[in-house]
C-alpha cells in the first residue's frame, strides 16, 4: 500500500525537515502496511519507531511520546492538519485512496430525488470527488463540492446549506455523515461504498434529538457527574471541564474531572459515577451502551 511513489514522497518530506529518528503514526486501516513502510524508510537512512496506539485523527497526535523518545519528527499519515500545536515537528502525509465513485453513483442516482446537492467525503477519498461531481452534473444535478468533512468538523460543507436541497456523503462509516446531519437542517444522504447502499439520515437527526432529551431528563435526578477530559492534544478542553464542574456544583451535584487518553468502561470500575459529561471526541457519546451510563455533551448540561 506504500508503493515506491509514496515512499519517495514521504522520504522527501522527511529530508526537508532534516529528520533522522522519526515516529510513524497511522490509522488502524493502514497498520497492515506500516511495517513495509518502516523497512523502506530504514533503507533510506531513517531510524523508524512505529506507534501502535489507536489513532482517531489529527486531533490524536503522539507528539509527546515521540519527543520523549528523542525523535526529530512525527510522521502522521492519513489525516489532514487541524492546526493542533505540537511539541516537535509533525509531518502530515495525506493518504488518498485510489477509488472511483462513478460506478456506484451510476447504480444509485435514480434514487436521489433532490436536484441541488452538496457532495462531501472524507480526506482519503478527496481525489474521487471531481469525477463524481462531473458524472452527477451529466445526469442533470446541480452539484457543489463541499470537500472533506469529519464527524466533529463540517464547517466547510455547512456554508452551502442555504443553496442546496441535500448533502450527499460518499464514503464508509456513519460517524462522519451523522456528524454532518446533526449540524445541518437539510437531509444528508449516505452512499456507503462498503455495503453499497443509499441511506437518508434525516430520520436519525430526529431520533438523536429524542435520545438527547431523554438523557437530559434522566440526568436531572442523578447526583454524581464525571467530566471527561482527554489528554489528546486536539481534544483536551480543561477550561471547559472546570467551568462545567463549577456549574454542576452550584446546582448541588457532585462533579469530578476525569482525565484519560482513551476512555473505556473498565477505567471507571470502582467509581460511583452516574452521568458522564463528554468534553472529548463526539464518538464517545455514541458509546453509551459500552459505558452503561448517561452521557451528555457540554451543551446538554446547560439544560439540566
Tell what function each PLM region has.
Residues 258-261, 277-278:
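A conserved acidic, glycine/proline-rich C-terminal tail/linker
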Residues 79-82, 172-175, 232-233, 281-284, ...:
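Short glycine-rich anion-binding loops that position phosphate/pyrophosphate groups of nucleotides
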Residues 1, 73, 261-271, 286, ...:
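Asparagine-biased alpha-helical interface segments
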Residues 175-254, 262-270:
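Redox- and metal-dependent alpha/beta enzyme cores, enriched for Fe-S-associated oxidoreductases
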Residues 85-86, 237, 286-291:
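Glycine/threonine-rich flexible loop motifs
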Residues 194-198, 203-205, 279-304:
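Peripheral docking tails and interdomain loops at the edges
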Residues 2-9, 14-206, 210-211, 260:
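The feature marks the mature, well-folded catalytic cores of soluble enzymes
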Residues 80, 273-275:
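Binding-cleft/active-site segments that stabilize strongly anionic ligands or cofactors
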